[in-house]
Amino acid sequence: DLIVGLPYENKQRFGLSFNDLFSLQPHALQIGFLKLLKGSGVRRMKEYQYISDLLAPYEVLSTHVLPYRDIRFLKHFEDVFERFYNSERFRTVFGYIGSKLIKEHTDTSITGEDTETNHVPPMKKYDPSKVETKNDAFSYFCDMTQAWLDAGNHKINLKDIDQIEFLYNFFLSKGDTVAAELLQYDTLVS
């Protein structure tokens, strides 16, 4: 499970954690949001500037490094990821996409471990300005989420065929005809 809203974790840092877990090729990856329960220690920690929903389940709405707009986007990200990847309705196409994205995953893990020598250097302070944009799983699903939002799909309840059409058009917009064909296969066998 990944939790959005942990201390010092901005959107980029969350993306690194997502990529590290995605590279393990899980059949599902659950994304949750930090809840600030009444009486909890973290709720009283002022340095994180937590703002949470006043009603249960008291989910975090913003932190000192994660503004509301990023948390809102990650809510949509979680919906899109759950709807398409975690549903396992499209195993073949996301297996193919996952294998491509994992190959392009950064050469180092979140700890900075060199994957060739297994040497772990001393931990350095995380600097989000030094994170390179790559063709990784987090970026890919962010693009998918943005396309979902741009199409206004988050405002309506789409039928399965409309969700499949969205995916098909998204894959084609990425120039990935193989993914589009695998989607057709998944649709036929499910």
State the predicted function of each range.
Residues D1-E104:
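A structural motif corresponding to the C-terminal lobe/cap of the Radical SAM core domain
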Residues D79-S190:
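Radical SAM enzyme core and accessory elements
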